[in-house]
Amino acid sequence: MVMVMEKKPYIISNVGMTLDGKLATINNDSRISCEEDLIRVHKIRANVDGIMVGIGTVLKDDPRLTVHKIKSDRNPVRIVVDSKLRVPLNARVLNKDAKTIIATTEDTNEEKEKKIKILEDMGVEVVKCGRGKVDLKKLMDILYDKGIKSILLEGGGTLNWGMFKEGLVDEVSVYIAPKIFGGKEAPTYVDGEGFKTVDECVKLELKNFYRLGEGIVLEFKVKK
């Protein structure tokens, strides 16, 4: 893993997907990665400062976002992008296994402020940045200043789109499983409104590839 000295964390976008780019079936069955790939991901987790997901991933999967498939003496900071502060108070990402940062907007109301107080009493740090939706560029500045210099992005299609659109991703690591899910409503790696032209799109440089279990891993550098 090559670290680039910038005033933002080095972002690795990781995904396990089917050959047709799906993250799950239309019924949210996301059994895609093999055990070998899960170990690969946890090795990356063990070597970064933070793991970032969107609130959609928390609501659908209730992940722990810790290093538990391999032996490790540390867990990265867990970062959840949650514009409307919808995180359930019993979500596993809020447990004491690792530090958690919830990124939400500066928009406020009485109910939201009460929930922030509850989260802070639970030991969760709440960061406010942006109006309407979380300002991802500003969030990266805040996280960098907190000493988080590298992040594994394990987002769904919405957060991934926001990060790619803002030019914040440095590296892409993809496990492709030999499966076809289909379904126009099935979640994909990158959603959002999409780029209008090829000239605007994110361009990648293939750095490495190898077989893993029944699938294949592709590693790319994002061209800046």
From Swiss-Prot:
Biological process, per Gene Ontology: riboflavin biosynthetic process
Domain of life: Archaea
Chain positions recorded as NADP(+) binding sites: G16, T57, D61, S83, K84, L85, R86, V134, G156, G157, T158, L159
Protein name: 2,5-diamino-6-ribosylamino-4(3H)-pyrimidinone 5'-phosphate reductase
InterPro entries found in the cross-reference section: DHFR-like_dom_sf (IPR024072), Rib_reduct_arc (IPR006401), RibD_C (IPR011549), RibDG_C (IPR002734), Riboflavin_Biosynth_HTPR (IPR050765)
Family: Belongs to the HTP reductase family.
Assembly with partners or alone: Homodimer.
Keyword annotations of the record: NAD, NADP, Oxidoreductase, Riboflavin biosynthesis
A single MF term (Gene Ontology): protein dimerization activity
Residue ranges of the TM segments: none
Function field: Catalyzes an early step in riboflavin biosynthesis, the NAD(P)H-dependent reduction of the ribose side chain of 2,5-diamino-6-ribosylamino-4(3H)-pyrimidinone 5'-phosphate, yielding 2,5-diamino-6-ribitylamino-4(3H)-pyrimidinone 5'-phosphate. The beta anomer is the authentic substrate, and the alpha anomer can serve as substrate subsequent to spontaneous anomerization. NADPH and NADH function equally well as the reductants. Does not catalyze the reduction of 5-amino-6-(5-phospho-D-ribosylamino)uracil to 5-amino-6-(5-phospho-D-ribitylamino)uracil.
Catalytic activity line of the entry: 2,5-diamino-6-(1-D-ribitylamino)pyrimidin-4(3H)-one 5'-phosphate + NADP(+) = 2,5-diamino-6-(1-D-ribosylamino)pyrimidin-4(3H)-one 5'-phosphate + NADPH + H(+); 2,5-diamino-6-(1-D-ribitylamino)pyrimidin-4(3H)-one 5'-phosphate + NAD(+) = 2,5-diamino-6-(1-D-ribosylamino)pyrimidin-4(3H)-one 5'-phosphate + NADH + H(+)
Coiled coil: none
Note: The protein sequence in PubMed:16730025 comes from protein expressed and processed in E.coli. Using chirally deuterated NADPH, the enzyme was shown to be A-type reductase catalyzing the transfer of deuterium from the 4(R) position of NADPH to the 1' (S) position of the substrate.
Record keyword Oxidoreductase present: yes
Pathway info: Cofactor biosynthesis; riboflavin biosynthesis
Enzyme Commission code(s) on record: 1.1.1.302
Upper taxonomic lineage: Archaea, Methanobacteriati, Methanobacteriota, Methanomada group, Methanococci
First-tier enzyme category under EC: oxidoreductase
